[in-house]
């Protein structure tokens, strides 16, 4: 049934976001109390977006937060992190993901953090996420940065602590895997678009619960190759899928379905690992001609943002929501 639903979503682009709330009251803990030294400044950026700035480990960091105007603060609200790619920006991520409209429709909050600048002997960038691999020379603690944002969000909003998710493009996808491994107690599920796991994330991964994983990738991606990149410390996509299928005790081999778009000259392969613990799932969507991009229905018959929310919203920290 789940396989048919996702394939229908890809073919028709008509699936709305999921969103059934789970009864997680017994898991809720009181929001943290700010230490006296913590200071955060939030300003109105328009269109229901706030820009919040604070100093983290002696670096000025910021994030953009979108709260739908019609959000019900009396009900527990799911929270989605959307992480930009290497050298990218939070504002650009807002534009190409279009998660705001999905948040309006499905009642969740979206946070778009901004990565810190990075300079090493090999590379230099205006922004990055420290997830190992080619960013291993960084001394930025992005896991703690994200957790600090979570703690602040709990103070300001009625966040459902069992339904905090992460997704990202490229380096943001790598970071989402890194959070699944290193902030597992806070992150219910993740989705990666054109990202993978770095060698460090893969080797040191220590999740605390079965974790739903969605990977969307292009077979022709030259930046994060499907087969991996040893020089830059990138695991192959099959290696990443196999890691999570094994950790979640899924069936060793996936169920595979292929949607052919003959007129457009491409196909989309869908791999679904079944019978995982807590009814979670590990899923790979592989587009035959996609390169390094965030796909949508109009360009590649693949509505990534809709598919991501439909996938993530099925789960909380305890697995599939009843």
Which residues does each predicted region cover?
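Serine-hydrolase catalytic machinery in alpha/beta-hydrolase-like enzymes
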Residues: 53-70, 74-165, 174-178, 182, ...
């Amino acid at each position: 049934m789940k396989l048919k639903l996702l394939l229908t979503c890809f073919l028709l682009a008509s699936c709305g976001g999921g969103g059934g709330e789970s009864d997680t009251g017994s898991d809720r803990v009181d929001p943290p109390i700010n230490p006296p030294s913590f200071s955060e400044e939030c300003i109105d950026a328009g269109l229901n977006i706030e820009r919040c700035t604070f100093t983290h480990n002696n670096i000025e960091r910021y994030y953009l937060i979108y709260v739908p105007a019609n959000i019900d603060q009396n009900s527990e609200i799911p929270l989605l992190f959307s992480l930009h790619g290497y050298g990218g920006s939070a504002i650009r991520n807002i534009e190409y993901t279009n998660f705001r409209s999905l948040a309006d429709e499905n009642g969740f909050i979206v946070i778009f953090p901004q990565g810190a600048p990075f300079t090493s002997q090999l590379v230099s960038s205006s922004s990055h996420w420290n997830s190992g691999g080619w960013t291993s020379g960084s001394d930025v603690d992005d896991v703690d940065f994200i957790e600090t944002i979570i703690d602040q969000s709990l103070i300001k909003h009625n966040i459902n602590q069992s339904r905090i998710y992460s997704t990202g493009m490229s380096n943001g996808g790598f970071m989402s895997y890194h959070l699944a491994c290193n902030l597992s107690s806070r992150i219910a599920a993740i989705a990666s678009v054109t990202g993978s796991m770095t060698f460090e994330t893969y080797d040191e991964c220590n999740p605390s619960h079965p974790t739903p994983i969605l990977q969307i990738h292009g077979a022709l991606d030259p930046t994060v190759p499907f087969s991996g990149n040893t020089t830059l410390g990138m695991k192959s996509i099959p290696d990443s899928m196999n890691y999570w299928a094994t950790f979640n005790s899924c069936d060793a081999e996936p169920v595979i379905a292929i949607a052919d778009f003959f007129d457009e000259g491409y196909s989309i392969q869908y791999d679904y690992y079944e019978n995982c613990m807590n009814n979670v799932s590990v899923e790979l969507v592989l587009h035959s001609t996609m390169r390094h991009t965030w796909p949508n229905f109009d360009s590649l018959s693949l509505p990534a943002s809709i598919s991501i929310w439909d996938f993530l919203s099925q789960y909380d920290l305890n697995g599939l929501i009843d």
